[in-house]
Amino acid sequence: MNTREIGNEYEDKSVEILVKEDYKILERNYQNKFGEIDIIAEKNKEIIFIEVKYRKTNKFGYGYEAVDRRKIMKILKLANYYIQSKKYQDYKIRFDCMSYLGDELDWIKNIVWGDEVGF
């Protein structure tokens, strides 16, 4: 399997988990002029922007470590554009990372708090 196929596999696993926990999947691999986010979901009037990361081993770090300041700034711009264009201004906003080390999931909720960055 190439890296794209592996990425899709773990995004699929993440979607399965989200659906089991009653999240509604709004978008997958959403792109706009600011970048791309793996999953956008909704639950209880909250929009969740989710980055999925996979590492076979932690030799080069954990997946969530790839969600650095630069990536976060792109996600924030992308999210703001999405919220405005889709009319979700009355929703709370959350940013998560679903990070896999092998098949072990570390779901980090609120990697950035929306109200801390002006949402």
Curated annotation (Swiss-Prot):
Gene3D superfamilies: 3.40.1350.10. Pfam families: UPF0102. InterPro entries: Restrct_endonuc-II-like, tRNA_endonuc-like_dom_sf, UPF0102_YraN-like. One of its GO terms (molecular function) is nucleic acid binding. Belongs to the UPF0102 family. HAMAP family: UPF0102. This is UPF0102 protein FN1370. It comes from Fusobacterium nucleatum subsp. nucleatum (strain ATCC 25586 / DSM 15643 / BCRC 10681 / CIP 101130 / JCM 8532 / KCTC 2640 / LMG 13131 / VPI 4355).
